[in-house]
């Protein structure tokens, strides 16, 4: 739990990275650059699980110096150690290669001390006074992540189930290959397609299509059979949907923040805060549904959690059809 807490605290770098891209990009450059940063996450998502699966249980996989009782008793230590070294390398690269994105006169002259911690922790409540367009985007992202993390928390439970019980009978390495494929699709969509698509279609439309594809994919789990082609088809829907959603939503949020004259880092921080709540609630909710339905029959079976995740994604889609106020539309027009 402590390790997960520290990892979650470190996720603040996501908001900073997106704000950095927003600071140095024009509106025309935003979709492509948000796509590139999303593609980098996708690349890690592609390679990471595969490496993790390969490094798991080195006593059995590699033998030699790892063929000891200690490595047999700690089969997951090597992938965790490798991940920690990668995180350290990332920090060093950020210090070495990234200059400050804002000129000195645009930087906030505020000291961060213990007196400001409470103020920073209450920033989530500032969502209530933000413009409706920004609130809708933040809530959409939060609900989308809720659906996505519900799937992510239970997908491996499903794939590890024996085939006779309705699962796929996959081991850690096979699951790693599946997630590597998901990452590959994400890299293709965010690293190349999103830039071209944003030149032909509205960014908001791309975001909505991404949510719809993800909802369809989530609702299609578990698959009718463990046939690899069907597995990859459904995961393609989810990966492509997420690949369209993430950069499009970040682009829209950046644009709306600029239109309303809001601090981009603060807005991104609020969004990541709500996203963190979704990442907490999603796995807990999914585990509860899974435990209550996995041995059921009829409508209440191991299918249920994935169907619920799909419905949650549809709810995220519906949030975007709530009307903006007339005052806000007029204000945006004048801006």
Question: How would you label these PLM feature ranges?
Answer:
Residues 57-84, 171, 288-313:
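A membrane-interface helix-boundary motif in multi-pass transporters
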Residues 32-60, 272-282:
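Glycine-rich segments within core transmembrane alpha-helices of 12-TM secondary carriers
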Residues 204-249:
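C-terminal transmembrane helical hairpin of 12-TM major facilitator-type secondary transporters
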Residues 11-26, 244-260:
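Intracellular juxtamembrane helix-capping segments at the cytosolic ends
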Residues 188-203, 290:
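Helix-to-loop junctions at the C-terminal end of transmembrane segments
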Residues 99-140, 161, 165-167, 335:
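Juxtamembrane intracellular "pre-TM" segments in multi-pass secondary transporters
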Residues 2-41:
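Cytoplasmic helix-loop-helix junction between adjacent transmembrane helices
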């Amino acid at each position: 739990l402590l390790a997960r807490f520290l990892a979650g605290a470190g996720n603040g770098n996501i908001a900073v990275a997106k704000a950095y891209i927003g600071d140095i990009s024009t509106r025309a450059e935003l979709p492509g650059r948000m796509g590139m940063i999303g593609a980098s996450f996708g690349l890690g998502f592609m390679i990471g699980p595969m490496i993790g699966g390969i490094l798991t249980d080195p006593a059995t996989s590699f033998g030699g110096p790892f063929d000891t009782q200690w490595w047999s008793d700690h089969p997951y230590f090597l992938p965790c150690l490798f991940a920690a070294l990668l995180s350290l390398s990332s920090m060093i690269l950020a210090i070495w290669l990234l200059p400050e994105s804002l000129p000195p006169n645009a930087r906030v002259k505020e000291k961060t001390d213990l007196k400001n911690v409470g103020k920073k922790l209450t920033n989530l409540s500032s969502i209530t006074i933000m413009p409706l367009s920004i609130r809708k985007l933040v809530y959409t992202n939060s609900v989308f992540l809720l659906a996505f993390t519900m799937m992510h928390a239970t997908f491996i439970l499903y794939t590890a189930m024996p085939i006779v019980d309705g699962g796929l009978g996959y081991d850690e390495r096979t699951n790693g290959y599946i997630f590597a494929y998901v990452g590959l699709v994400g890299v293709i969509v965010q690293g190349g397609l999103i830039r071209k698509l944003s030149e032909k279609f509205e960014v908001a439309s791309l975001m909505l299509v991404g949510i719809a594809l993800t909802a369809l994919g989530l609702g299609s789990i578990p698959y009718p059979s463990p046939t690899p082609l069907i597995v990859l088809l459904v995961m393609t829907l989810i990966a492509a949907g997420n690949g369209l959603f993430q950069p499009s939503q970040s682009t829209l949020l950046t644009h709306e923040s600029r239109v309303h004259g809001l601090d981009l880092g603060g807005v991104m921080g609020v969004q990541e805060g709500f996203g963190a709540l979704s990442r907490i609630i999603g796995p807990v909710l999914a585990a509860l549904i899974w435990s209550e339905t996995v041995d059921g029959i009829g409508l209440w079976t191991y299918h249920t959690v994935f169907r619920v995740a799909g419905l949650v994604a549809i709810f995220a889609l519906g949030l975007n059809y709530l009307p903006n106020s007339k005052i806000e539309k007029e204000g945006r027009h004048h801006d």
